[in-house]
């Protein structure tokens, strides 16, 4: 039995509950990256107003069929926001030990080297071209069908979904 944390996200599209995605975090390999994500799932980190910050009620703002689904920008909701549990806007790449070698991997979205924050993506295909550029830190262990349903959501400009794809609840199992 793994001692690595398992988190969940309950997903709804335009208010219609799809179901739950469960993700195992690779805390033994990338502990800082995994902990940053875990705390944003639980809401235990407080923002400047002393209210919990995190993924609850945030959206998947970028979907590219045959590649990945991206979310986690609870700051601005459009892919420009960043926050960490480390009292900084970003944090360095922890390591690139894990590869983007299969669908269902959780990886950090970034704006270049050492620019990790709160945004993440889940792969829907192997993406070896991301190796050495994005930190893999978890994998979907249940609810991959939900990931695929999100991936099939129609998108408009900038790969932005035409529907509201929201994380309506999240936490740690």
From Swiss-Prot:
Chain ranges of the PPIase cyclophilin-type domain: 8-172
Location(s) in or outside the cell: Cytoplasm, Cytoskeleton, Microtubule organizing center, Spindle pole body
Pfam families, alphabetized: Pro_isomerase
One Gene Ontology term, aspect cellular component: intracellular membrane-bounded organelle
Catalysis performed (reactions): [protein]-peptidylproline (omega=180) = [protein]-peptidylproline (omega=0)
Keyword set, alphabetical order: Cytoplasm, Cytoskeleton, Isomerase, Rotamase
InterPro entries: Cyclophilin-like_dom_sf, Cyclophilin-type_PPIase, Cyclophilin-type_PPIase_CS, Cyclophilin-type_PPIase_dom
Main location: cytoplasm
Domain of life: Eukaryota
GO BP terms, alphabetized: mRNA cis splicing, via spliceosome; protein folding
Entry's family note: Belongs to the cyclophilin-type PPIase family. PPIase H subfamily.
Protein's UniProt name: Peptidyl-prolyl cis-trans isomerase cyp3
Gene source species: Schizosaccharomyces pombe (strain 972 / ATCC 24843)
């Amino acid at each position: 039995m793994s001692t690595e944390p398992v988190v969940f996200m309950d997903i709804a599209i335009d208010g219609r509950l799809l179901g739950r995605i469960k993700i195992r975090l690779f805390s033994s390999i990338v502990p800082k990256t995994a902990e940053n994500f875990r705390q944003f799932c639980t809401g235990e980190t407080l923002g400047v107003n002393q209210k919990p910050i995190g993924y609850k009620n945030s959206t998947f703002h970028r979907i590219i069929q045959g590649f990945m689904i991206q979310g986690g920008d609870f700051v601005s909701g459009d892919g420009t926001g960043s926050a960490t549990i480390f009292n900084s806007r970003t944090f360095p790449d922890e390591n690139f030990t894990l590869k983007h070698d299969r669908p269902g991997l959780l990886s950090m979205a970034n704006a270049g080297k050492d620019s990790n924050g709160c945004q993440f993506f889940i792969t829907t295909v192997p993406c070896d071209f991301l190796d050495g550029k994005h930190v893999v830190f978890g994998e979907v262990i249940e609810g991959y069908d939900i990931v695929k349903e999100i991936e099939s959501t129609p998108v408009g400009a900038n790969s932005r979904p035409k529907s509201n794809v929201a994380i309506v609840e999240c936490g740690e199992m």
